[in-house]
């Protein structure tokens, strides 16, 4: 069985990156929650 995690920086950024989060209303809510919680890293 192949491993499910096949890393790709490009896919990671496109799906979970800061600009991807900012692009949608819900994504901005994610960032707001993470800021409120005090996360050191907001996004990938």
Curated annotation (Swiss-Prot):
It comes from the Bacteria. Keywords: Ribonucleoprotein, Ribosomal protein. PROSITE patterns: RIBOSOMAL_L34. GO terms for cellular component: ribonucleoprotein complex; ribosome. The keyword tRNA-binding does not apply. GO terms for biological process: translation. GO terms for molecular function: structural constituent of ribosome. Transmembrane segments: none annotated. Pfam families: Ribosomal_L34. NCBIfam families: rpmH_bact. Belongs to the bacterial ribosomal protein bL34 family. This is Large ribosomal subunit protein bL34. It comes from Chromohalobacter salexigens (strain ATCC BAA-138 / DSM 3043 / CIP 106854 / NCIMB 13768 / 1H11). The gene is rpmH.
């Amino acid at each position: 069985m192949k491993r499910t995690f096949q890393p790709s920086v490009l896919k990671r950024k496109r799906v979970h990156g800061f600009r991807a989060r900012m692009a949608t209303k819900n994504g901005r809510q994610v960032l707001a929650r993470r800021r409120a919680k005090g996360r050191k890293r907001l996004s990938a």
